[in-house]
């Protein structure tokens, strides 16, 4: 297929720990894996890479189907379909059709409503591996979002295998990056996330830089988007059980989810 594109899971920018956990998750035979993050953060790319990893392991022996809005890249050995709401081909309708075909792996472009969520969770409970995205303010807030869709907490507890949050940051322009001193609160946050030893290493050996703006970057101070910041929750995390049962504001969770990795190719 000349329009097919290969996505390499090892080039997503995940650190070794997160990459192995992600591979472990997509290697499971059943359950629901969710990716969350803003538009353009790389969620779909990560899912395509996950499907590529499954195909690399099993070839076309595993039946994979997708419902997308729209299909962003053609994938070999994957039965892909695009939504067509004008003709009634919505996420719920498409998923019901897919369930009759009995695929082993199902990619759902996005869980947007209660009906889609119910079908995806039911598929994850009945012998399918479902990989999808959902818009949420945070990784832990994914559970509150699904509960607000009237999904029963016990269903989430038994179905969700893991949640991966993805963010992309812009890198400094290499032509105008100059040394600078971050504000005290930023240094304190870095100290809390990474520890005093890591912070001191940055100060002593690398320093901090900020793009001043030049003609090469159209005076923005930034280059291209290449820096990924990730956090993840897996079935083993205590916070999954807590998040499912938490009734308060997701932004007030007493747990803090710190980035699992940062990568700058």
Predicted segment positions?
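Short, flexible helix-loop junctions that flank or precede catalytic/ligand sites
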Residues: 1-265
């Amino acid at each position: 297929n000349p329009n097919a594109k290969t996505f390499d899971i090892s080039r997503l920018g995940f650190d070794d720990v997160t990459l192995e956990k992600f591979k472990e998750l997509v290697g499971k035979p059943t359950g629901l894996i969710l990716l969350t993050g803003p538009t353009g953060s790389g969620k779909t790319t990560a899912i395509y890479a996950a499907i590529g990893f499954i195909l690399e392991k099993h070839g076309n022996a595993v039946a994979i189907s997708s419902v997308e809005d729209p299909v962003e890249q053609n994938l070999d050995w994957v039965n892909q379909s695009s939504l067509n709401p004008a003709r009634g081909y919505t996420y719920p309708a498409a998923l019901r059709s897919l369930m009759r075909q009995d695929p082993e792996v199902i990619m759902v472009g996005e869980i947007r409503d209660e009906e889609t969520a119910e079908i995806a969770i039911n598929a994850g409970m009945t012998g399918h591996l479902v990989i999808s995205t959902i818009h949420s303010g945070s990784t832990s807030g994914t559970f509150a979002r699904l509960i607000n869709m009237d999904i029963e907490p016990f269903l989430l507890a038994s179905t969700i295998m893991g949640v991966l949050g993805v963010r992309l940051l812009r890198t400094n322009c290499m032509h105008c990056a100059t040394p600078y001193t971050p504000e005290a609160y930023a240094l304190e946050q870095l100290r809390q996330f990474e520890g005093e030893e890591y912070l001191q290493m940055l100060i002593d050996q690398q320093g901090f830089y900020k793009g001043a703006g030049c003609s090469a970057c159209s005076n923005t101070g930034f280059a291209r988007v290449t820096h990924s910041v990730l956090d993840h929750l897996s079935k083993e995390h205590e916070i999954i059980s807590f998040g499912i049962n938490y009734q308060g504001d997701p932004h007030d969770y007493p747990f803090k989810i710190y980035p699992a990795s940062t990568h700058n190719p």
